[in-house]
Amino acid sequence: EKNDKKIRESLLAKRWCGITNRNGVNYDIKQIGNNYYMNEFSAAIGLVQLKKLDTLNNIHRKIAKRYSQEIKLNTKMQFDKNCSYHLYWILVKNRNEFRKKMSKCGIETGTHYKPIHTFSLYKSKTKLKNTENIGKSIVTIPCHPGLNESDIEKIIRLTNKFS
């Protein structure tokens, strides 16, 4: 419980520029922090977007279902009707080559899931072979409401061709 209190205090301080004891005159800054408060303009946009959330998630799911059914790879996301699919990932043998070929055809891909233990902040001497192998192979393909039917067909066709 003592640790929980310390963690809570640390998180509260980080949320407001690292400042502790914000209500008193004897505040201090013990760590680097940020200002995570949302301004009114961003909040207004967020409220409007929230009204569209179900519709947008359904579009993501529709695209993901097509990918799950039509992309001919053994290792890809399995369709789950409860997932929002803000990203859709696949595993390819040569990620760099796959991304270059897709880019030449006008399809943006991404690498969103680099293994955490390889970042400087978390760097350790631990070897996680499976995590590292997946980290070198995972790539995301477009899965957003701006895609039209021909975009989706092209992504499926070229993913099957280049993977």
What spans do the regions from the language model cover?
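PLP-dependent aminotransferase class I/II
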Residues: N3-S163
